[in-house]
Amino acid sequence: MKGQVMIEFIKTPIRKLLNLHLRWVCKREFRKQSFSRFNERPVELAFVFKHIARIYPRKVLDVGTGATALPHLMRNCGCLVTSIDNIEDYWPSEMVNRHYHVINDDITNSKLQDKFDLITCVSVLEHIEDSESAIRNMFTLLNTGGYLILTFPYTENKYCKNVYKLPGSSYGQNNPYITQSYSRNELSQWLEENNGIIIKQTYWQFWDGDFWTVGNQIIPPFEVGVEDKHQISCLLIQKK
């Protein structure tokens, strides 16, 4: 009993000190806010939570979390959430996520042994050069009948290896990673090889050019049809 009291006596000031640092970090981020540009997250996260509300998955895996709060928000929904990212190889300064615990795991060669009802991969796949291995591993980690939510740059009829290198690209030229824009060919191949079916696919126009980042940004973006100009797609896929 005395030992437990002593442990709590030591832990309390340490906890207060850690909380003080966290408050300082949050306040600093708040004060340093500056507007640069809008991004695609409102569209993508709306798609994610719309389908979580319909599926109500028990076990969820978020792939490529980075420093985002998505796993924390899904945990707030009651889901049991696992979060992974290739921290040591992809992030130059070993990223720290203060919202949720992120496991260091490369989805192209995942060491996870668990199975999941839903896997989310939001604006991540396009930065992975070996996309096929990433998709294959995500399907492997899904339960039969489970769901995969993918969002990425997409142009129905033409693939692009790196949109940042296209004439007229508005940003990204100095980024150390690529951003691919997928097409129906890549998507169909993934589904055929991994026994998946599309449950829902939406298309969005964010730019007046043909590919993501090309031309003038359109804010707010438009949800359009597959035959219309679009640069982003959100997909709900089921493993058969």
Q: Where do the PLM segments sit?
A:
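N-terminal auxiliary segments of SAM/dcSAM-dependent transferases
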Residues: K2-T12
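S-adenosyl-L-methionine-dependent methyltransferase catalytic module, highlighting the catalytic core
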Residues: R15, F35, E94, T108, ...
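Residues that cap or flank secondary-structure elements
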Residues: S36, E40, L61-D62, T179
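Class I SAM-dependent methyltransferase Rossmann-like catalytic core
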Residues: T12-N19, R23-I52
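Conserved SAM-binding loop
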Residues: A46-C160
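Residue-level marker of regulatory loop/turn positions in helix-turn-helix DNA-binding domains and
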Residues: E40, V63, Q113, V226-K229
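A short, structure-level motif marking secondary-structure boundaries and short turns
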Residues: Q33-S34, I55-Y56, D62, Y171-Q173
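Membrane-embedded glycan transfer/ligation machinery
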Residues: P42, T68, Q231
